[in-house]
């Protein structure tokens, strides 16, 4: 299955995180907290990373299934190819570089990724608070990777990327945040931190 992501993000400080967390807790009763672990993979030539795409396996503390995702950079929103993974296929990918049939494998092959040399590069942990508001999802993330902790907010629109930007700019004004057109994704920040070690 593939879907287009219509979202915008902003990096925030720990103090801003605490302020926004308090705001969510005091103003919304339907806030969900989700704990997830992302494992990022690539082939020996770093084919996925070179074109700014992302290949990951995401697991959630609340269930045993995992989600395999290949995220392809797009001009008007990224396209995600997703499929659920059983325990068996998780180990086939991470230990033996064997992929199940499906949309992720098909797209990786189309993009010239060498599936036989796929390896696990790093892990990123996220504590996510999210609340559905009208036609968008408000997300508050704490991210941990390679000894680094950072924070961001994210707006996932049901309408358009433009709508997501309009909404996030309102929150930037409300909380005194700085919007940056060149936001660096958490996966990219984590990869960049590997290069510094």
Give the positions of each predicted feature:
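Phosphate-end processing signature that detects enzymes handling 5′-triphosphorylated RNA
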Residues: 1-197
């Amino acid at each position: 299955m593939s879907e287009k992501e219509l979202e915008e993000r902003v990096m925030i400080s720990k103090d801003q995180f605490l302020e926004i967390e308090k705001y969510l807790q005091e103003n919304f009763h339907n806030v969900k907290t989700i704990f997830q672990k992302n494992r990022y993979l690539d082939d020996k030539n770093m084919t996925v990373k070179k074109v700014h795409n992302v290949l990951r396996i995401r697991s959630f503390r609340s269930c045993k299934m995992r989600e395999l995702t290949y995220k392809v950079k797009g001009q008007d929103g990224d396209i995600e190819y997703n499929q659920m993974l059983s325990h068996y296929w998780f180990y086939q990918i991470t230990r033996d570089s064997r992929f199940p049939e499906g949309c992720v494998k098909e797209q990786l092959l189309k993009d010239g990724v060498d599936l036989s040399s796929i390896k696990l590069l790093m892990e990123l942990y996220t504590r996510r608070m999210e609340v559905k508001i009208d036609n968008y999802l408000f997300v508050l993330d704490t991210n941990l990777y390679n000894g680094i902790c950072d924070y961001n907010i994210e707006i996932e629109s049901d309408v358009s990327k433009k709508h997501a930007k309009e909404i996030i700019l309102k929150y930037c004004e409300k909380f005194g945040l700085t919007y940056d057109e060149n936001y660096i994704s958490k996966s990219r920040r984590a990869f960049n931190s590997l290069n510094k070690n």
